[in-house]
Structures are given as structure tokens and as C-alpha cells.
Regions:
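RNase H-like (RuvC/DEDD) metal-dependent nuclease/polynucleotide-processing core
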Residues: 2-9, 13-202
Length: 202
């Protein structure tokens, strides 16, 4: 059964260091023909914590589908684990909790996971060796590529403007924070009625 959503939110996310992030934007639209509208950030510029608080506070107003443009989990099938060789949980929700406990970074940041705690899994430049050795994709991304959808980014690539690594691991901290209020698909069942968080990252 598909939930009957009456409102839709798209969140342009950021993994940048710091407390507030000009790269974050939140758009909202209702069913019907009206154009989406931008949601003003508290204080003029969004923080990741602001987004989490906003989602939690608005999710109960009306059934809303919240979409985030980051990867909800690293590849698992391709490598037999999220961070093979390291002792980490083997399912999404427990892994999000692990990331949140591990990272002392400001405003739900997660750069320390990539740069220190699990550094060997991430490509930061030529000193790390052959980049192709880090280019692991999730099963859905491999299918997307095989179908001609284009080359997906991987959370293990931590260099360049197009990298999604820092944003994705920061996003996992948000998922851990909001999961008690709003289910997160496909890790949680679809609600019969109510709000839901999904990934819209490709």
C-alpha cells in the first residue's frame, strides 16, 4: 500500500564543516499545481540541526514525503560490509547510531570519520593510490549505471566539489536523530498514514 502524501519536501544537503551552510536549501510543495516554495531558514542560513528540528516539528502536521540528496548508507553487497575490516554495525540504523556516537563534529558533521577514524577507506588524492580501488557502488547504483543512467558518485570518494562522502555521513547523523519520529524507507516499513523520509540522491 502506497501512503497518501499531501505534502512534499526536497532538501539540498551539505556536508561542509561549520555551524551554518549556504549549500543547504529546503523546498516544499503541496499536492496540486502550485510551484514549490523555498522554506526560510532560522536566522537566514540553515544548519543541519535546524533541518532535523524542522523535519521533526513539521512531520506531524500532514503526511509529508521528505527527500534528501545524500546516500543513506555505504555500499554493503560490493564489499561485504560498510567499512570492511573495521568493527562497525552491519545494518543501516545501527550504523547511523555508530556514526553519530563516533563523530564529535559540529552541527551533525562527520568529516572526522573520513579524515581520522576510518581514513583508509576514503580517497582524498593521489597519495592514497589508484582511485579506481575506492570506486565501490551500491547494488542500486550498479543497476543505475548498467541501465545507462550515468556514472553515480560513491561515498568513498572524498575529493572534489562533486564528492558526496562528507554530506552522506553527516546525513546519517540526521537520520539517526529523526528516525524515532519519522520512518526512513527502505529501512523502516511504509506507514499506512503519516510522513516518510526517502533518499533522492543518485
Amino acid at each position: 500500500m502506497t501512503p497518501d502524501f499531501t505534502r512534499f519536501a526536497a532538501i539540498d544537503w551539505s556536508g561542509a564543516k561549520g555551524a551554518r551552510h549556504k549549500g543547504i536549501a529546503v523546498a516544499l510543495c503541496d499536492t496540486g499545481q502550485e510551484a514549490p516554495r523555498l522554506v526560510s531558514a532560522p536566522g537566514g542560513v540553515w544548519s543541519r540541526t535546524d533541518v532535523a528540528d524542522w523535519l521533526i516539528s513539521t512531520a506531524g502536521e500532514t503526511p509529508t514525503l521528505f527527500g534528501f540528496d545524500f546516500s543513506f548508507a555505504p555500499p554493503f553487497v560490493a564489499r561485504g560490509g560498510y567499512l570492511p575490516g573495521d568493527t562497525v554495525p552491519d545494518n543501516g540504523p545501527d550504523f547511523w547510531a555508530y556514526v553519530d556516537r563516533l563523530c564529535p563534529d559540529e552541527d551533525l558533521g562527520a568529516a572526522s570519520l573520513l579524515e581520522v577514524a576510518h581514513r583508509r577507506h576514503f580517497y582524498f588524492g593521489k597519495a592514497d593510490g589508484v582511485k579506481a580501488d575506492y570506486m565501490h557502488n551500491r547494488a542500486c547504483e550498479a543497476l543505475y549505471l548498467a541501465g545507462g543512467g550515468g556514472k553515480p558518485s560513491t561515498v568513498y570518494d572524498a575529493i572534489g566539489a562533486a564528492q558526496v562522502a562528507k554530506a552522506s555521513f553527516a546525513g546519517m547523523r540526521l537520520l539517526h536523530r529523526v528516525r524515532g519520529t519519522v520512518p526512513i524507507w527502505p529501512f523502516d516499513p511504509l506507514p499506512v498514514r503519516g510522513s516518510l523520509v526517502v533518499e533522492i540522491y543518485t
